[in-house]
UniProtKB/Swiss-Prot annotation:
The protein's name: Coenzyme PQQ synthesis protein A
Assigned keywords, A-Z: Plasmid, PQQ biosynthesis
This protein's encoding gene: pqqA
BP GO terms, sorted: pyrroloquinoline quinone biosynthetic process
Coiled coil: none
Functional description taken from the UniProt entry: Required for coenzyme pyrroloquinoline quinone (PQQ) biosynthesis. PQQ is probably formed by cross-linking a specific glutamate to a specific tyrosine residue and excising these residues from the peptide.
Top-rank taxon: Bacteria
One Pfam family named in its UniProt record: PqqA
Organism: Rhizobium meliloti (strain 1021)
Family annotation (InterPro entries): PQQ_synth_PqqA
NCBIfam families documented for this protein: PQQ_syn_pqqA
Pathway membership, UniProt: Cofactor biosynthesis; pyrroloquinoline quinone biosynthesis
Amino acid sequence: MAWHKPKFIEVSCAMEITRYAPADGDEPILF
């Protein structure tokens, strides 16, 4: 279960970055 917390943090960070990323960025908006 130790890896669950960091995983959640990574996902949250990815979602936050995606939120502020431009729609025409390198990666498509998935969230």
